[in-house]
């Protein structure tokens, strides 16, 4: 896939479809051009189920530590990687591998983590942020995190987090201030 920077309408030619992130505004010149040309446009949130549906997804969410945790996981698990920061191990935020495994940094900012189909869900913490997406409603925010965890077969949580510690889910509970050897 060719990446063209900066954004320009000339980049939109005859693509089958366009995928855009939550950071892209509706008036983005490429998104506007794609719509003018009748090209289907999908948000990252909408396309995730199709990208991850047949994969064994190792998903990491949380307000802090997602990229670090995801990069560490990516060094341990053979497979594709989609994370938020550049991995020092492979020099990119993405790695493709012919494997069913995908290490995925799950995004709670737009609740797209609910579309990530996790086999394993790790939540480093559930500190309230991006509250505008949740209508400034803590119950909605926490329900999204709980929903993310409920979708996974295996769950790992920070048992010292104020919210996560209250969940009545079967999960590996880590206590980072004292002991992380329970994995």
Predicted feature locations:
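Long, basic/Gly/Ser/Thr-rich N-terminal segments
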Residues: 1-4, 8
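Phosphate-binding loop of NTP-binding sites
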Residues: 10-14, 22-173, 181-183
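Cytosolic ligand/metal-binding cores
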Residues: 18
């Amino acid at each position: 896939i060719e990446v063209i920077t900066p954004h320009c309408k000339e980049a939109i030619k005859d693509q089958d479809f366009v995928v855009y992130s939550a950071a892209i505004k509706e008036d983005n010149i490429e998104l506007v051009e794609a719509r003018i040309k009748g090209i289907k446009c999908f948000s990252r949130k909408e396309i995730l189920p199709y990208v991850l549906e047949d994969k064994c997804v190792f998903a990491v969410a949380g307000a802090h530590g997602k990229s670090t945790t995801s990069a560490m996981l990516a060094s341990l698990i053979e497979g594709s990687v989609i994370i938020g920061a550049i991995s020092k191990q492979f020099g990119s935020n993405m790695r493709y591998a012919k494997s069913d495994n995908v290490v995925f940094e799950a995004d709670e900012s737009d609740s797209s983590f609910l579309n990530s189909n996790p086999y394993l869900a790790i939540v480093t913490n559930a500190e309230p942020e991006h509250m505008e997406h949740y209508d400034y409603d803590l119950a909605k925010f926490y329900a999204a995190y709980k929903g993310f965890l409920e979708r996974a077969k295996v769950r790992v949580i920070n048992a010292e987090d104020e919210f996560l510690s209250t969940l009545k889910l079967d999960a590996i509970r880590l206590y980072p201030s004292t002991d992380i050897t329970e994995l």
